[in-house]
């Protein structure tokens, strides 16, 4: 995992060029954190993320102290406190020994030989027995954050490929599929171990071949490798082998035909006939293998359809169970009773509305009826000419002239009574008799100025 100086300088922090700062960071830790916690925590906070980023840049999920010392060498010096940093990362759960990481492997991993990871190095065992806190240089540690990233990328690559139609793959097929994700076989094994922890992968060994089974999309966890899985895998391998054989025989038959043409041009008719007979034999063999290939494909199609039918049946069963739960307590009698109650309430509401409508005063007649009535009124209305009297046809008699002059006639008229004056009934009777006498042509009685009625104000 050695990296060139040019690549390292591209992702190292700016403090890497500060000699004074790096002299402090390259120095050893104090024996006890309580002596100077600032010094201790400052170095841990610098080296921990740098180690993780270094592994991410290299594409690895494992790290050991020897590689770190070599890659972090600066001006001939190596960091003296990386062993303490590794121990701190172990306590915080950022890294884990390979042996501890693979502690829960199943029999499939052991059959692969991955169980060798469980054997702790002798140096580490002796160090633990002697109470030494130093980390062996060659002890490998798994960076938990990075192995989870690799596992997620591997699962996404499988589900996005054409191989996702197959649940069981050979390790070599998976190795080819993940070559751009996992640079080596060890990294791939670590990613598979993480996927196994997440219940997305299980492994097995069949007739000396390493097999990996993935969980399908929509499944919460992967199921163990069954005899059905192995049978399907063998059929798929047979299909692939037959396709390769048929293709090879096709090329061989074509080659024999071309050779027969060449010999015929050279005048070697007998040899050309032998090549042509060989071509026919190859074609017959290819046809026989092609028929076998079609049979295998038909079986695989039937298996796929049966699996689809099984999923459909499971969906039906789940649907029936859900309907049974949702319809619990619902009966036809209850439904009819509810419908009758609803109809009864609707009838009651209609009766109430009719009662309220009949008791209310007439809001008015229809607008069309009102328009008709207005039109009839207009037709029956009197014309404007009828408002004036008819023109007389005989001579008009001039008004009769009185013998009294106008001034005398005005004086002859009684004064307008003043409603504000206090006039008694006797005075009104006397005034009425006077007017009656005046109308008969008798001389009117003089009225004192005090008794004369004043005009109305």
Curated annotation (Swiss-Prot):
GO annotation (BP), single: late endosome to vacuole transport
Any one cellular-component term (Gene Ontology): ESCRT III complex
The organism's place on the tree of life at top rank: Eukaryota
Main localization of the protein described in the UniProt heading: cytoplasm
Compartments it resides in: Cytoplasm; Nucleus envelope
Keywords (A to Z) from UniProt: Coiled coil, Cytoplasm, Nucleus, Protein transport, Transport
Region (Disordered): 381-401, 435-457
Chain coiled-coil ranges: 234-266, 331-382
Function, in words: ESCRT-III-like protein required to recruit the ESCRT-III complex to the nuclear envelope during late anaphase. Together with SPAST, the ESCRT-III complex promotes nuclear envelope sealing and mitotic spindle disassembly during late anaphase. Plays a role in the endosomal sorting pathway.
Family under the similarity heading: Belongs to the SNF7 family.
Protein name, entry field: Charged multivesicular body protein 7
Organism: Danio rerio
């Amino acid at each position: 995992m050695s990296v060139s100086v040019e690549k390292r300088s591209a992702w190292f922090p700016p403090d890497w060029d500060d000699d004074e700062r790096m002299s402090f960071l390259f120095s050893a830790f104090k024996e006890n954190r309580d002596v100077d916690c600032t010094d201790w925590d400052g170095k841990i906070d610098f080296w921990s993320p740098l180690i993780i980023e270094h592994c991410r840049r290299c594409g690895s999920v494992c790290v050991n102290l020897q590689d770190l010392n070599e890659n972090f060498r600066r001006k001939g010096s190596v960091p003296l406190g990386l062993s303490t940093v590794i121990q701190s990362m172990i306590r915080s759960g950022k890294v884990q020994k390979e042996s501890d990481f693979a502690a829960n492997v199943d029999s499939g991993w052991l059959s692969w030989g991955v169980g060798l990871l469980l054997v702790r190095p002798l140096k580490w065992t002796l160090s633990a027995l002697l109470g030494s806190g130093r980390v062996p240089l060659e002890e490998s540690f798994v960076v938990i954050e990075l192995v989870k990233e690799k596992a997620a990328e591997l699962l996404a690559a499988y589900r996005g490929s054409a191989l996702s139609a197959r649940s069981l793959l050979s390790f070599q097929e998976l190795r080819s599929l993940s070559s751009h994700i996992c640079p080596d076989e060890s990294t791939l094994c670590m990613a598979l171990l993480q996927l196994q922890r997440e219940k997305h992968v299980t492994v097995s060994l069949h007739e000396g071949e390493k097999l990996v089974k993935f969980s399908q999309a929509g499944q919460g966890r992967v199921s163990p490798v069954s005899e059905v899985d192995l049978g399907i895998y063998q059929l798929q391998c047979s299909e692939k082998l037959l396709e390769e054989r048929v293709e090879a025989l096709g090329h061989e038959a074509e080659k024999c035909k071309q050779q027969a043409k060449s010999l015929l041009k050279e005048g070697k008719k007998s040899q050309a006939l032998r090549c042509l007979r060989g071509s026919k034999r190859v074609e017959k063999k290819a046809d026989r293998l092609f028929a076998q290939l079609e049979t295998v494909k038909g079986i695989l199609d039937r298996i796929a359809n049966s699996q689809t039918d099984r999923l459909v049946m499971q969906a039906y069963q789940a649907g029936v169970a859900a309907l049974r739960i949702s319809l619990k307590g619902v009966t036809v009698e209850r439904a009819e009773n509810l419908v009758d109650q609803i109809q009864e309430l609707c009838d009651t509401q209609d009766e109430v509305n009719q009662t309220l409508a009949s008791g209310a005063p007439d809001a008015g007649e229809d607008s069309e009826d009102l328009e008709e009535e207005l039109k009839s009124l207009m037709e029956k209305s009197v014309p404007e000419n009828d408002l004036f009297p008819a023109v007389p046809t005989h001579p008009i008699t001039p008004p009769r002239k009185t013998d009294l002059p106008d001034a005398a006639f005005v004086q002859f008229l009684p004064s307008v009574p003043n409603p504000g004056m206090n006039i008694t009934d006797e005075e009104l009777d006397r005034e009425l008799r006077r007017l009656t006498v005046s109308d008969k042509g008798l001389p009117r009685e003089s009225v004192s100025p005090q008794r004369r009625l004043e005009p109305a104000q």
